[in-house]
Design a protein with these regions (language model features):
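Conserved ATP-binding N-box helix of the HATPase_c
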Residues: 55-78, 130
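Short beta-to-alpha transition helix within the HATPase_c
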Residues: 3-7, 18-35
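Short beta-strand/loop element within the Bergerat-fold HATPase_c
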Residues: 80-92
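Conserved glycine-/histidine-rich ATP-lid loop and adjacent helix of the Bergerat-fold HATPase_c
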Residues: 123-133
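Conserved short strand/loop->alpha-helix "switch" segment adjacent to the catalytic nucleotide/phosphoryl-transfer site
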Residues: 15, 40-62
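Heptad-repeat coiled-coil segments of the DHp/HisKA dimerization-phosphoacceptor module
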Residues: 43-49, 89, 100-102, 139
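Glycine-rich ATP-binding loops of the HATPase_c
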Residues: 132-145
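Glycine-rich/acidic phosphate-handling loop/turn and adjacent ATP-lid/helix
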Residues: 90-122, 149-151
């Protein structure tokens, strides 16, 4: 009986992706949105409690990245759309990488003119640049990839 209760309680606890509550909250919201849209959602976050970016700006970046991924995956025309988010530290940088299914005809190359970017990408880039961060966006073979890095 107790084992069954523990399993039930564990299944009702909100997913905890990392030590950072802002990141946890954003990922939980988009995990639920992806599930509602029948999009597989995977997230691995090794973010620390404190990040080099304010909570407000972290939400602006991460929510825009994952919101774009949600729309891209929904429009991908694949039978099994997916979104994968990885947050980790490498070479004294905090890195956010988001990959999602996208329409196979979508082309997005690193040297693409900024005039062709949408509002979400402009917001991601301007917020990242505020912290000396860098961004890279690509789309190849039905996969869109957004990478944002900040000095930690």
């Amino acid at each position: 009986y107790l084992e069954k209760q523990n399993v039930e309680m564990d299944s009702q606890r909100p997913q905890r992706f990392c030590e950072n509550e802002t990141i946890n909250n954003v990922l939980r919201v988009y995990e639920a949105k992806a599930k509602a849209a029948n999009i597989r959602f995977n997230a691995n976050a090794a973010a620390r409690k404190e990040t080099p970016v304010s909570s407000h700006d972290l939400v602006a970046i991460l929510a825009n990245v994952v919101e774009n991924a949600l729309h891209g995956a929904a429009d991908s025309e694949t039978s099994e759309p997916v979104i994968s988010v990885d947050i980790y530290y490498k070479a004294k940088k905090m890195v956010i990488v988001c990959e999602n299914s996208c329409h196979p005809s979508l082309e997005f190359v690193p040297d693409m003119s900024r005039e062709l970017w949408g509002v979400g990408i402009h917001s991601i880039v301007s917020t990242a640049e505020k912290y000396g961060g860098t961004c890279r966006f690509t789309a190849q073979n039905g996969v869109f990839k957004a990478t944002v890095a900040f000095t930690s």
